[in-house]
Amino acid sequence: MSDSKDELIRMFFDEEAILFGRFILTSGKESNYYINVKKLSTKPRALKLIAKLMAGEAQKRGITFDRVAGPELGAVPIATALALETEKPLVIVRKKPKGHGTGSQLEGEVKAGDKVLLVEDVTTTGGSVLRAAEVLEREGAEIAAIMVVVDREEGAEETIGAKYTFLPLVRVSELFARRKEPQKE
């Protein structure tokens, strides 16, 4: 494991970005833990590290892309940081077309044939990021890969991987393998 990835995993614990309790996820599933990547993505040091890791992973895998995209809301700061890191244009994918102005579901430009690196904060089943991929493809984009900060390992890799290259920076099993035990007082 790289030092940078190890640092990211430590940040999840240091910033208390893993919560335990009862949570309903975007997928509709119930979970006894919640991975709050948004908490990390509001911290400049963590956000910069995520962008650096994503850019490095794309380069290591030989993934070329013209644009970086992310679905609202959780992926927007991540996609923005990665766009800055790679100096590639940013595209934001809305959950639904806006009801005013142009009525577009995309903010930013996508041209037919553009290769897009689509990023997400957390995946469970992969449904949200797959819907974003469909929106981009309707506009003529090609999905170069889908990269996620944390994969919860609940089906997203199989679902997304059936059609796209799927690259999680961290799997939830890696987070839990490093989970700090409560200190005895």
Curated annotation (Swiss-Prot):
InterPro entries: OPRT (IPR023031), Or_phspho_trans_dom (IPR004467), PRibTrfase_dom (IPR000836), PRTase-like (IPR029057). Its EC number is 2.4.2.10. 5-phospho-alpha-D-ribose 1-diphosphate binds at residues 94-95, 98, 100, 120-128. Orotate binds at residues 124, 152. GO terms for biological process: 'de novo' UMP biosynthetic process; pyrimidine nucleobase biosynthetic process; UMP biosynthetic process. Its cofactor is Mg(2+). It catalyses: orotidine 5'-phosphate + diphosphate = orotate + 5-phospho-alpha-D-ribose 1-diphosphate. Pathway: Pyrimidine metabolism; UMP biosynthesis via de novo pathway; UMP from orotate: step 1/2. It comes from the Archaea. It is an enzyme of class 2 (transferase). Keywords: Glycosyltransferase, Magnesium, Pyrimidine biosynthesis, Transferase. Gene3D superfamilies: 3.40.50.2020. It holds the Pfam family Pribosyltran. One of its GO terms (molecular function) is orotate phosphoribosyltransferase activity. SUPFAM superfamilies: PRTase-like. Catalyzes the transfer of a ribosyl phosphate group from 5-phosphoribose 1-diphosphate to orotate, leading to the formation of orotidine monophosphate (OMP). Homodimer. HAMAP family: PyrE. Belongs to the purine/pyrimidine phosphoribosyltransferase family. PyrE subfamily. This is Orotate phosphoribosyltransferase. It comes from Thermococcus kodakarensis (strain ATCC BAA-918 / JCM 12380 / KOD1) (Pyrococcus kodakaraensis (strain KOD1)). The lineage of its organism: Archaea, Methanobacteriati, Methanobacteriota, Thermococci, Thermococcales. The gene is pyrE.
